[in-house]
């Protein structure tokens, strides 16, 4: 993962934010924008995890309330050498998952009931390993900063539109041009930067997640099924809060309008191809069939009481022992 590139992109967003502040209030406005950006990121650093979990009405679970799901995450965290994160369930039909938290010691992972119901245990393990990889790579903090700055830039762009820019510094045509730049170009640029940061980190999390769960094909199979599910099962909460879309393993937005054109995630087929190549290099060829052959569970799923097919393969079980066993 290129941390230098990420730092440069975040710096670029900060410059955009300060530039809009300058258009609104000259040098003083620029400094105020900088102070606001710092304050928002400090607030996001300490509170972003609580905010997003509350936004999606996530329910915290433990070994008693969700034994198999909790133990799976515990085993994967041990594989990764991470502290045990808090574990959440989101009551949402669309299969998806995300991680949040400012550092590995204050991390949380969340999966939707749609994910736990529709995917095999192997696939769920691949997904949760991917989310733990984000925690280990500290992507959750980076993306919180990026999302905060992107939201702030859009907010200031709207202010510039309504206020018409700084009257003293932007009269006539230049004032109109400056306002248009603040209203359209800066938020658009912030969105592009946000996507660039998100996409580079997804590939790294896929690779590390495959290492954590031990089988890249579990994750590749899961990505395909989640992507198909996201196209036909809307996530209403995500549609209302599109700034959080980058947090999920697959873009939860429905694809209406410009969602597909400006995706926060790399192309799913490219991610699957990279994982399949990784599996081939590891000499793993048959695990994908085990995962893909598992019928979607319509029972209690691997987070609650053990269902008949919770092991993933009703024909004698999986050849591969996963961390849920």
Swiss-Prot record:
Its EC number is 3.4.24.-. GO terms for molecular function: metalloendopeptidase activity; zinc ion binding. Residues 306-325 have a biased composition (Low complexity). Its main location: membrane. Keywords: Cell inner membrane, Cell membrane, Hydrolase, Membrane, Metal-binding, Metalloprotease, Protease, Transmembrane, Transmembrane helix, Zinc. GO terms for biological process: proteolysis. It is a multi-pass membrane protein. Its cofactor is Zn(2+). The active site is at 131. It is an enzyme of class 3 (hydrolase). Residues 288-325 are annotated as: Disordered. It is found in: Cell inner membrane. GO terms for cellular component: plasma membrane. The chain crosses the membrane at residues 20-40, 145-165, 173-193. Binds 1 zinc ion per subunit. CDD domains: M48B_HtpX_like. Zn(2+) binds at residues 130, 134, 202. The keyword Signal does not apply. Belongs to the peptidase M48B family. This is Protease HtpX homolog. It comes from Brucella abortus (strain 2308). The gene is htpX.
């Amino acid at each position: 993962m290129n941390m230098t590139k990420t730092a440069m992109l975040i710096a670029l967003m900060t410059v955009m934010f300060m530039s809009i502040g300058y258009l609104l209030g000259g040098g003083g406005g620029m400094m105020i924008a900088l102070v606001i950006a710092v304050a928002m990121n400090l607030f996001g650093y300490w509170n972003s995890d609580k905010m997003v979990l509350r936004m999606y009405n996530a329910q915290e679970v433990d070994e008693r309330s969700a034994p198999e799901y909790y133990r799976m995450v515990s085993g994967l965290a041990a594989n990764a050498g991470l502290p045990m994160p808090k574990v959440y369930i989101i009551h949402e039909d669309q299969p998806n998952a995300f991680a949040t938290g400012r550092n590995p010691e204050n991390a949380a992972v969340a999966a939707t009931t749609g994910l736990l119901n529709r995917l095999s245990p192997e696939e769920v393990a691949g997904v949760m390993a991917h989310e733990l990889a984000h925690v280990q790579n500290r992507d959750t903090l980076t993306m919180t900063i990026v999302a905060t700055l992107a939201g702030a830039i859009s907010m200031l762009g709207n202010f510039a539109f309504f206020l018409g820019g700084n009257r003293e510094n932007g009269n006539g045509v230049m004032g109109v041009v400056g306002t248009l730049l603040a209203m359209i170009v800066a938020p658009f640029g912030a969105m592009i930067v946000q996507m660039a940061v998100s996409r580079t980190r997804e590939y790294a999390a896929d690779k590390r997640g495959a290492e954590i769960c031990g089988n890249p094909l579990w994750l590749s199979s899961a990505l395909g099924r989640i992507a198909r599910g996201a196209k036909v099962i809307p996530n209403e909460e995500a549609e209302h809060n599109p700034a959080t879309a980058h947090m999920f393993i697959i873009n939860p937005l429905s694809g209406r309008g410009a969602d597909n054109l400006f995706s926060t995630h790399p192309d799913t087929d490219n991610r699957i191809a990279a994982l399949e190549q990784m599996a081939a290099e590891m000499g793993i060829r048959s695990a994908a069939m085990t995962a893909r052959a598992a019928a979607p569970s319509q029972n209690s799923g691997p987070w609650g009481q053990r269902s008949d097919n919770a092991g993933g393969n009703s024909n004698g079980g999986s050849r591969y022992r996963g961390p849920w066993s």
